[in-house]
Amino acid sequence: MKKIYSTLVALLATANMFAQGWPANYSGVMLQGFSWDSYDYSQWTVLEKQADDMKGFIDLVWLPQSGKCIETEKVMGYKPYYYFNQNSSFGTEVELKSLIAKFKANGIGAIADVVVNHRNTDGWFTFPAETYKGVTYQMLSTDICKNDDGNKTATQATKDGVSLSQNYDEGTDFRGCRDIDHKSANVQKIIKAYLKFLKEDIGYTGFRYDMVKGFSGTHVADYNDATGVKFSVGEYWDGNESIINWINKTNKKSAAFDFQFRYNVRDAIGVKDNKIVSSPNWSKLKSDYNLMHDPVYRQYAITFVENHDMQFRSADEPLDPLKRDTLAANAYMLAMPGTPCVFQPHWRAYKQEIKSMIEARKLAGITNMSNYTNKMAQTNCFANETTGDKAKLIVVVGNNTKAYTPSADYAQILEGYHYRYYLSKSAETAWCNIPSGEYEAGFRAKLTAVSQNSNAKLVYTTDGTAPTAKSKQVATGSTINIDETCTLKVGLLINGNVTGIRTYNYTVKAFEPYTITVYANADQVTNWGSAIYFYAWNSSETFTKAWPGTAATATKTLNGKKWYYMDFKIKSKDAIVNIIFNQGNGTGKKQTVDLNAGNSTKYYEITTTQSNGKYTCKDVTADMPTTGITAAPTIDNTASKDNAWYTLSGMKMMQKPNQPGIYIHQGKKQVIK
C-alpha cells in the first residue's frame, strides 16, 4: 500500500509540474527565432547551423508557425490552413524535425507558434481533411463562431445554405479568417490531436499561443492538460490587469508575454510609434505596472522589449520599434526576473554583447522568480540589484551610467552604450568580457577577478587545460590577445590556489565566400522553351537582373536529362538564395512557385503540378549521383603539381576552403567539415 501511495504522489507531483504553465525558479532565456518576413534568417536549415553557437546561452527558441498555409507565396503562417502538414515557408517537415533534434542535442527546447484562434479556409467554409494516426480530422462550418467576421460569414452562410455554430465568439474577432468555436467538441478533439502531434511527433517542447484574446483561457488550460506540455505562453496584448485575469482563467497553466514591461522600456527610452517623442527618462523603469514586478505573477512573465508585431517593417508599416538604446533595453531585461525573450534582430546585431549579458545572468543564478531592489531612479540613470541563487547582479542603464557607483562589494564586469553590469564579489569567479562563439578576426579580451580578496590574480591557459598557479598570470582588468581558435580557461589565483575557473571556446575563422550552382530541368512541362529565366534574390541583394531575371541558356546533360544552371556567390555565412524559374515577360508565361535553395548546390525538376497557377518543383538533389559531377577538374599532380581546390561546379578556389562542403582536390572529392 505504501508503494502504491508513493506512486500516486509522484504522478500527482508530475501532473502538477506540467500544470504550472511555466516552471518555477526557471533560469532559462528564450530567443524569438524570427522577425517579420525573416524567411532568409529563419529557415530551419539556417537555424540548425546556429544551434552550436546558441548552446549554453539560449534555452528555448520560439519558432515561426510551421504548418503549411494555403497561399503559394511566402507567408509568416498566421492564417493557418493545415495542421498536420508541417511544410512551410521556413522549410520542410524533415528539416524542422532535424532542427528540433539538433536543438535538443544542445540543450535547447523549441516553442511552437500555435495559431488556433482562427483558421483559413478554401472559400468561405471548407477546411482540409487531414489524417493522423489513422484518424481523419476535419473542421466543419458548424465549428465557425456564429458572429464571425462581423457577421459577414453568417450572411454568406445564409446565401450558401450552410449552418454555423450557435455559439458566439468568446473574444476579439479576427477578420479575414474563420474564428473557431472552442466550445465545439469537434474543434477540441482536433486541436488536442494537433498539439499532441506537435509535441510527440515533431518534438516541440512548448507552445506559444497566438491571439489568446480571441477565446477563453479555460481552453488553453484544457489543451495543456491534454498535452502535458511543460512550457506555455499566451499572447494577450492588453493592460496588466487583463493579462493577470487571463492567466487566472488558465488556472495559472500558462505564462503570458509581459506587454507592459515592454512599454515601460519603450517609454523610458522616449519613443512611440516609430517616433522619438521625448528625451529618455530612465526613471520610468521604476514601475509596478507589469507582471515582472509582482512576486505572485513574475513566474508567468515572459519579458521582451520588441517583437515581430512592433518592429519597423516598412515606411507603410512603421509600427512601434525601439529605434534607439536597444542594447540598454536588453541589458535591463536580461538582469531582471521573469523569463526574458530576446528578439532575433537584436540577437543578430548584438550577439556578442547579449551573450555576455546572458552569461552574467546565469552566473548570478537569476531566475524568473528572483527578487530585486531599486538602487537609483533618475532621469539619466537607473539601477536595480537582482538577487540570484548564486550572487547578486546590478544593472545600470541610462545616458549617464557613471552617476551610480555600487559599494566595494561589487566588481564591474560589463560596460557598453548606456549600460553597465556589476557582479557581487561573493561570486568568487574569474570573468572574461568576450563570450564563447565564432569570430571572423582576432580580438582583445578583458579578464576580471570577481573576488572579495583584493589580492586575487588571474591565471589562464589557451590550450583547454586547467590553469594552475604556474600558468600565465595577469592582474584584474588586464587584456589578452586571442588571435586563433582556442579554448580559454581562466581562474582566480588566491594564496596559491586556483578557483572560480571559467571556460570560453573561441573559433576564429574569417568567412570565405563560395559559389553554389542551382540546376533546373523542365522536361516534364510541355512547350517550356529553349531557355529558363532564373530570378534569384535574398534579403540583401538580387543576384540576377530585375524580373523576370536572367536567361540561363547554358546546359549540362546529367543522368540523361538536360539541366539549365546558374552559379551564385554566397557572401556571408547566413546568406541564402531564393529563386523563381520562369519563361520571361509576357501574358501567359509560365513560372514556378518561390523556392528556397539555401546555401548549397541544388537540383530542381519543374513538375506539371500547379499551385494557384504556378508550377511546383521537386528537389532531387539527394537523387543526383555524386552530386551530378560527371568529371572532376583535371589536375596533373606529377607534371604541374597543381594543388588547387575546386568547387563542385568547377570554380577554382584561391586557397583551401574554410566553408564546410564537398570540394575537388588533386582529382578526388574532399569533404571539409
Segments and roles (model prediction):
Residues 20-36, 46-55, 65-67, 72-79, ...:
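Active-site-proximal helices and loops of the catalytic beta/alpha 8
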Residues 466-477, 524-572, 584-594:
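Aromatic-rich carbohydrate-binding modules that target alpha-glucans
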Residues 627-673:
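C-terminal outer-membrane/trafficking sorting elements
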Residues 479-487, 570-575, 657-659:
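Surface-exposed, short loops/turns at beta-strand junctions within beta-sandwich domains
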Residues 399-401, 449-457, 525-530, 540, ...:
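Short proline/glycine-enriched turn/loop motifs at strand-loop junctions of beta-rich domains
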Residues 26, 69-101, 131-181:
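Aromatic- and acidic-residue-enriched carbohydrate-binding clefts of CAZyme catalytic domains
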Residues 426-512:
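Short, compositionally stereotyped local motifs that mark structural "simplifiers"
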Residues 92-128, 132-134:
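Substrate-binding cleft of carbohydrate-active enzyme catalytic domains
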